[in-house]
């Protein structure tokens, strides 16, 4: 289904290559199909055109975050792999923090990734803050 969605997005972009909504849709499909590098490049182009596009920051942040999570699931973690995971979390961080600033009402989307990043990067003050927000959110949405 996602392949056909990608085909539709590509056809829409053939008709109107400058349409931001079509480009954003394609970036989301790329994110959901694990084409992280392509997603990042497309979203960076979107941000260059309009740096207030919250969802573009979210997609880039999740592209880096998802790569870190996938690497973290591997049983045998070498020192190099652990370093790569930390690098991916660090690359994800500014995009997810920017998304949080641009879309504060979207807690369901940014709270868990930021929680995980702050925890793994040992960011005590930020972790304490996000832990409180996460607990409040969870208590209000039961």
Name each region found by the language model.
Residues 22, 56, 109-110:
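TPR alpha-solenoid repeat register
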Residues 19, 53, 106-107:
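Residue-level recognition of tetratricopeptide repeat
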Residues 26, 60, 67, 113-114:
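Structural register within alpha-helical repeat arrays
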Residues 65-98:
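Short coil/linker segments at helix-helix boundaries
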Residues 32-34, 61, 66-77, 120-124:
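Short coil/turn linking the two alpha-helices of tandem helical-hairpin repeats
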């Amino acid at each position: 289904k996602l392949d056909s969605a990608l085909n539709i997005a590509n056809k829409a972009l053939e008709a109107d290559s400058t349409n931001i909504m079509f480009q954003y849709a394609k970036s989301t499909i790329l994110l959901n199909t694990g084409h992280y590098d392509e997603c990042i490049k497309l979203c960076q182009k979107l941000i260059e055109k309009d740096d207030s596009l919250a969802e573009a920051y979210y997609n880039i942040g999740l592209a880096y975050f998802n790569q870190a999570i996938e690497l973290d699931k591997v049983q045998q973690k070498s020192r190099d792999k652990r370093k790569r995971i930390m690098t991916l979390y660090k690359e994800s961080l500014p995009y997810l923090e920017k998304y949080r600033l641009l879309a504060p009402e979207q807690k369901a989307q940014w709270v868990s990734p930021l929680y995980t990043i702050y925890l793994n990067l040992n960011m005590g003050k930020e972790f304490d803050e996000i832990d409180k927000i996460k607990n409040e959110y969870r208590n209000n949405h039961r």
